Amino acid sequence: MSGRLLDLFKPFEAFLPEVIAPERKVPYNQKLIWTAVSLLIFLVLGQIPLYGIVSSEGSDPLQWLRAMLASNRGTLMELGVSPIITSSMIFQFLQGTQLLQVNLESKQDRELFQIAQKVCAIVLTLGQAIVVVLTGNYGSVSNLGIAISLLLILQLVFASFIVLLLDELLIKGYGLGSGISLFTATNIAEQIFWKAFAPTTVNNGRGTEFEGAVVALFHLLSVRKDKKRALVEAFYRDYLPNMFQVLSTVFVFLFVLYLQGFRYELPVRSTRTRGQVGSYPIKLFYTSNTPIMLQSALTSNIFLTSQLLYQKFPNNPIVKMLGVWGTRSDAPYSPNAAISGLSYYIQPPFSFTEALLDPIKTVVYVTFVLGACAMFSRTWIDVSGTSPRDVSKQFKEQGLVINGRRETSVYRELKKVIPTAAAFGGATIGALSVGSDLLGTLGSGTSILMATTTIYGYYETAAKEGGFAKNLVAGFSEML
């Protein structure tokens, strides 16, 4: 049954565009060029406004998720990488629960699996585009008209398909790392940099102030006579980015960088060369930022569905259980937010005070994030080629065994360590995300973690392919 299900995607192979894998290894310098070109295309797409929108100035309940999903409201990148991540999440679930049997050693099965994910991503893009238009993000459908509404949907689908191909281009070896991670980290870094150094001014009734926290610090110190009061305002102003958030962001960045040095060294020896021993490192963040990306995609899809249903059926009790949406003056990103239902409980607390005043919500939110991240991390290893069985095959091919163990027991020993490490690492990154949210950073804690782990991942990739020193983080960990 499962095999036949995968075969249903065979007809799409003939006409679905695909990036052909390079016949030989792409030189490092060319990979840098392809990576830069892909990033430039993505950034351009994120600046081109959608043609035909009436307005995109209204409240945006998904604002806090946009950085993590590389989304930019009112542009071709409205949907960001959400459909692609969601497609990956769906097929991870199908394979992990054995509802879809895939032989990853078979080239045909691997190709069909990739085609199936691509088709699912396109379908999800179409579905999300329809939801975004129908919920009135660009004006009511009656004002837009059917033709403009269809044009908006087509623009969103086309842009998401371009991103899909760019991601495939990098993954297949033309560039460095994953396009999804690159685009997300760039979007997050751009927003953090803007909040810290934005030269734009605002007037909130307290005189002209700079939006960027660092710029505001120097401005307040230069124009205020009371320097102590100026420092307090620069560090704790609650209506614009402040220096406490900047320092919190730097602290989280350095702490995550420090944790990257945590690993369990599995002693191994060679069966081919007598006396040759070494170690196989199992990192704390075994699956990198994948768990938090999948958790963010899951949350965004729940929010989109809940918001659409609540607009259409506000009095339906089941819809209310999924989420009731209303206006909250304390919401930092948008006045429109979930005020009850499931969506409210998986929405992060807007402040440390709210977390204390509503302990039930806080406990549910923390449990959801940690549980989802641990589950996604544990199941991701089965579809990413890093499961105990995959690693034991690599050991066998390289003539390695665990020191003090027989060759036949390698898989059994790895099975004791890797799944536990993956789940614990996923829960850890979820806990860091929650802690960062409560601490207060420039952007959400999740986005800071995603950016940090992606930057470190690119550092490792560049170190491996470019050949420069790799001990920066190890030395940093030892220093701390």
Swiss-Prot record:
Residue intervals annotated with topology Cytoplasmic: 1-32, 97-118, 167-245, 384-416, 460-480
Transmembrane region(s): 33-53, 76-96, 119-139, 146-166, 246-266, 363-383, 417-435, 442-459
Gene Ontology CC terms, in alphabetical order: fungal-type vacuole; Sec61 translocon complex
The organism's place on the tree of life at top rank: Eukaryota
Bilayer topology term: Multi-pass membrane protein
GO terms, molecular function: peptide transmembrane transporter activity; protein transmembrane transporter activity; protein-transporting ATPase activity; ribosome binding; signal sequence binding
GO aspect biological process, one term: misfolded protein transport
Family affiliation: Belongs to the SecY/SEC61-alpha family.
Protein name: Protein transport protein SEC61 subunit alpha
Species annotation: Eremothecium gossypii (strain ATCC 10895 / CBS 109.51 / FGSC 9923 / NRRL Y-1056) (Yeast)
Lineage: Eukaryota, Fungi, Dikarya, Ascomycota, Saccharomycotina
Gene: SEC61
